[in-house]
Every structure is written in C-alpha cells, then in structure tokens.
Curated annotation (Swiss-Prot):
GO terms for molecular function: structural constituent of ribosome; tRNA binding. Part of the 30S ribosomal subunit. It holds the Pfam family Ribosomal_S10. It comes from Pseudomonas syringae pv. tomato (strain ATCC BAA-871 / DC3000). GO terms for cellular component: ribonucleoprotein complex; ribosome. The gene is rpsJ. SUPFAM superfamilies: Ribosomal protein S10. Belongs to the universal ribosomal protein uS10 family. GO terms for biological process: translation. Involved in the binding of tRNA to the ribosomes. Keywords: Ribonucleoprotein, Ribosomal protein. This is Small ribosomal subunit protein uS10.
Length: 103
C-alpha cells in the first residue's frame, strides 16, 4: 500500500456526531502508524423549507424549517495494512455517512 492515499468523506446532520466520528478515525489511523491530514471542514449545506401553517386561509402564517448537512474530509497518507484493517473494523455512529476512496 505504499504511495497510496485514502480519502474519507463524512456527512451528517449532527455536527457532534461527525466530530466524534472523525476523532475516532484520526485516533485509529495514528495508532496504527499512518499520517493523517485533516479533518478539513467543508461548507455546511443549509436547506430551508417554508410550510403554510393554515390549510385554507392566512397565507401570512408560515413555519420555516432548516436542515444542515455537515461535511468533513480526511486524508490518510501512506496507510499500512494495519491501518486498513483497523478502519474496516471501526464501528462509527449511526447517522454518519462515510465514503472511502483510494487514490
């Protein structure tokens, strides 16, 4: 696995969960002897929804909702066999989407 790099992208709606998961990944990678770049916070995507409260009249009465998608990127430089095995066995919190790519 020499001269390779693992890029890990994390997405979650809760910033505490994503920070906890990135911390676990960083600790696991460093414990196995790999060099870690990051976590790099990417821009948070904010989706806003406006819903009419009244089903018939009163168009001025509305509720607004927002959902935020937090993203982080980690690069693991020169991973070892131990690093890959440890990352595969790592159990992260539910609600965190993980994408792993080799490059």
């Amino acid at each position: 696995m020499q001269n390779q790099q693992i890029r890990i992208r994390l997405k979650a709606f809760d910033h505490r969960l994503i920070d906890q998961s990135t911390q676990e990944i960083v600790e696991t990678a460093k414990r196995t002897g790999a060099q870690v770049r990051g976590p790099i916070p990417l821009p948070t995507r904010k989706e806003r929804f406006t819903v009419l409260v009244s089903p018939h009249v009163n168009k001025d009465a509305r509720d607004q909702y927002e959902i935020r998608t937090h993203k982080r990127v980690l690069d693991i430089v020169q991973p070892t066999e131990k690093t890959v095995d440890a990352l595969m066995k790592l159990d992260l919190a539910a609600g965190v989407e993980v994408q792993i790519s080799l490059g």
